[in-house]
Amino acid sequence: MATVNQLVRKPRLRKIVKTNVPALEGSPQKRGVCTRVYTTTPKKPNSALRKVCRVRLTNGFEVTAYIGGEGHNLQEHSVILIRGGRVKDLPGVRYHIVRGSLDCAGVKERKKGRSKYGVKKAKV
């Protein structure tokens, strides 16, 4: 147990919490512009062509973001919104694109889990 005098001379160190999404700088989302839209392959044992894009954010960061859902309308110079959330089988992809916001359209024909893919309730 440290004495009061020892603590005055050298206070206890605070734990440093490292963020998993540094480009967001504490914000829930950030806006950015697509600089490159492409597909990439996941780590073993998975196999697919995952849709990702390189994004230049408003704060100057350049990050790789995952495009979720079936089909998308993104191309170079599309303005998009990104949120945190990594893709476990894609190394270096720590952000997701928010579907149904700005230039990114929602997923067509989506019936379940609509809120995650920017789809309005279907008219009956």
From Swiss-Prot:
<keyword id="KW-0689">Ribosomal protein</keyword>
<keyword id="KW-0488">Methylation</keyword>
<dbReference type="GO" id="GO:0000049">
    <property type="term" value="F:tRNA binding"/>
</dbReference>
<comment type="similarity">
    <text>Belongs to the universal ribosomal protein uS12 family.</text>
</comment>
<keyword id="KW-0820">tRNA-binding</keyword>
<comment type="subunit">
    <text>Part of the 30S ribosomal subunit. Contacts proteins S8 and S17. May interact with IF1 in the 30S initiation complex.</text>
</comment>
<keyword id="KW-0694">RNA-binding</keyword>
<dbReference type="GO" id="GO:0015935">
    <property type="term" value="C:small ribosomal subunit"/>
</dbReference>
<protein>
    <recommendedName>
        <fullName>Small ribosomal subunit protein uS12</fullName>
    </recommendedName>
</protein>
<comment type="function">
    <text>With S4 and S5 plays an important role in translational accuracy.</text>
</comment>
<comment type="function">
    <text>Interacts with and stabilizes bases of the 16S rRNA that are involved in tRNA selection in the A site and with the mRNA backbone. Located at the interface of the 30S and 50S subunits, it traverses the body of the 30S subunit contacting proteins on the other side and probably holding the rRNA structure together. The combined cluster of proteins S8, S12 and S17 appears to hold together the shoulder and platform of the 30S subunit.</text>
</comment>
<keyword id="KW-0687">Ribonucleoprotein</keyword>
<keyword id="KW-0699">rRNA-binding</keyword>
<dbReference type="GO" id="GO:0019843">
    <property type="term" value="F:rRNA binding"/>
</dbReference>
<dbReference type="InterPro" id="IPR012340">
    <property type="entry name" value="NA-bd_OB-fold"/>
</dbReference>
<dbReference type="InterPro" id="IPR006032">
    <property type="entry name" value="Ribosomal_uS12"/>
</dbReference>
<dbReference type="GO" id="GO:0003735">
    <property type="term" value="F:structural constituent of ribosome"/>
</dbReference>
<feature type="modified residue" description="3-methylthioaspartic acid">
    <location>
        <position position="89"/>
    </location>
</feature>
<dbReference type="Pfam" id="PF00164">
    <property type="entry name" value="Ribosom_S12_S23"/>
</dbReference>
<dbReference type="InterPro" id="IPR005679">
    <property type="entry name" value="Ribosomal_uS12_bac"/>
</dbReference>
<dbReference type="GO" id="GO:0006412">
    <property type="term" value="P:translation"/>
</dbReference>
